[in-house]
């Protein structure tokens, strides 16, 4: 049997390396597959943490170690201005509007797969790659389809739902077929410096910090009344921007003798600066039967037909829900749910799937219960 060995040495892949294990193994696998690999560390935030430690310095040192271990050149690029203009300003504007944004979706669209891709082009890249858990396949017509990562717990297609065909055609996802424990084993077997480094969490590039304190640095808080939907005053809130639909923690309200169920955020009135709360995880005020969405993007460049039935996620790591899509002339859409869904949150992403394929997504503008708009913003 003849074995065909592909020569990838003339194909340059610029890898966005964060200093974490996923992007480290991405670079390693591409190098092992014979590609011309270049590592690039992105600095997108002036990120001195709460202890005064610049985490970017530590991460860059890890990138340098891994690049040396793999045997690839590496560079650093500063996208702080682009991040501020394209992601963080949007993040603040959404909170000002009483919504709960998803900066990771915007960060992928505008920074990791746009600003970074433009920079990679200057390095004569044929492709870019990062450490995302997603997969792609190209059909006979040259259309790239994005599929869920094999590790269902790590799948990141939700955050990649705003990518275009042009972006996907230039992207490789070398760890998308792997489970997270396999990625760590590969790193350990290769002796990579990041093999045991813990995963980063928190806002894209901003990381883990006291969110309330962080947000108050940029937006002045406006305390106001906390009320039930029936108009009973329950106390005061610290500022609507600090609360999200369905939130339980931080309300400072206990049960009463008649009802011991916990309290949840069930709505916001931005004009009156009122935070609405209600008792019970499945409080009727939290249950929606449809939503409206804007900023729709379809990853293949082709929108599904009117009335198409598919599945959708409304939060990361949420189970899929069956939905039906209906378009409007203004470019928005109504998404009807097969079953009621709890805590649909304006500002978050709604992401659509056909089996394992991520079809695209949009931004949730409003939630409805049997055509009545819920008081969410």
From Swiss-Prot:
Recite the UniProt keywords alphabetically.
Answer: ATP-binding, Cytoplasm, Disulfide bond, Nucleotide-binding, RNA-binding, Transferase, tRNA processing, tRNA-binding
Q: Does the keyword Cytoplasm apply?
A: yes
Q: Which Pfam families match?
A: tRNA_Me_trans, tRNA_Me_trans_C, tRNA_Me_trans_M
Task: Specify the superkingdom.
Answer: Bacteria
Where does this protein hold ATP? 16-23, 42, 131
The chain's disulfide connectivity reads 107-204
E.C. designation(s): 2.8.1.13
Q: Cellular location of this protein?
A: Cytoplasm
Q: Where is this region: Interaction with target base in tRNA?
A: 102-104
Q: Which PANTHER family match?
A: MITOCHONDRIAL TRNA-SPECIFIC 2-THIOURIDYLASE 1, TRNA 5-METHYLAMINOMETHYL-2-THIOURIDYLATE -METHYLTRANSFERASE
Q: What is this protein called?
A: tRNA-specific 2-thiouridylase MnmA
Species the sequence originates in: Lacticaseibacillus paracasei (strain ATCC 334 / BCRC 17002 / CCUG 31169 / CIP 107868 / KCTC 3260 / NRRL B-441)
Organism lineage: Bacteria, Bacillati, Bacillota, Bacilli, Lactobacillales
Q: Name the gene.
A: mnmA
């Amino acid at each position: 049997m003849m074995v065909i060995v592909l020569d990838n040495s003339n194909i340059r892949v610029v890898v966005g390396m964060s200093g974490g294990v996923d992007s480290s193994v991405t670079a390693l696998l591409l190098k092992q597959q014979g590609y011309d690999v270049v590592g690039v560390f992105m600095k997108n935030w002036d990120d001195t943490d709460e202890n005064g430690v610049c985490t970017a310095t530590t991460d860059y040192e890890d990138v340098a170690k891994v690049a040396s271990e793999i045997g690839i050149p590496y560079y650093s690029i500063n996208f702080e201005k682009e991040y501020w203009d394209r992601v963080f300003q949007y993040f603040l504007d959404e909170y000002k509007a009483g919504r709960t944004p998803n900066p990771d979706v915007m960060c992928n669209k505008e920074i990791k797969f746009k600003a970074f891709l433009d920079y990679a082009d200057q390095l004569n890249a044929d492709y870019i790659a990062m450490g995302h858990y997603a997969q792609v396949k190209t059909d006979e017509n040259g259309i790239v389809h994005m599929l869920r990562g094999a590790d269902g717990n790590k799948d990141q297609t939700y955050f990649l739902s705003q990518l275009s065909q042009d972006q996907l055609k230039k992207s490789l996802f070398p760890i998308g077929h792997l489970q997270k424990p396999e990625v760590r084993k590969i790193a350990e077997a290769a002796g990579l410096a990041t093999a045991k480094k813990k995963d980063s969490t928190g806002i894209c590039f901003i990381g883990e910090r006291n969110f309330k304190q962080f947000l108050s640095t940029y937006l002045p808080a406006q305390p106001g009344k906390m009320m039930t939907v029936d108009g009973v005053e329950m106390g005061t809130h610290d500022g609507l921007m600090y609360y999200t639909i369905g939130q339980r923690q931080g309300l400072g309200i206990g049960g009463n003798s008649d009802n011991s169920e916990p309290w949840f955020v069930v709505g916001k009135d931005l004009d009156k600066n009122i935070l609405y709360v209600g008792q019970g995880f499945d409080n009727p005020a939290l249950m929606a039967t449809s939503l409206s969405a804007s900023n729709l993007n379809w990853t293949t460049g082709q929108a599904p037909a009117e009335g198409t039935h598919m599945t959708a996620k409304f939060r990361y790591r949420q189970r899929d829900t069956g939905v039906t899509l209906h378009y409007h002339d203004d470019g928005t859409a109504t998404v009807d749910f097969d079953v009621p869904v709890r805590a649909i949150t304006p500002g978050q992403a709604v992401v659509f799937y056909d089996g394992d394929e991520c079809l695209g997504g949009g931004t949730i503008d409003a939630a409805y219960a049997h055509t009545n708009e819920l008081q969410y913003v």
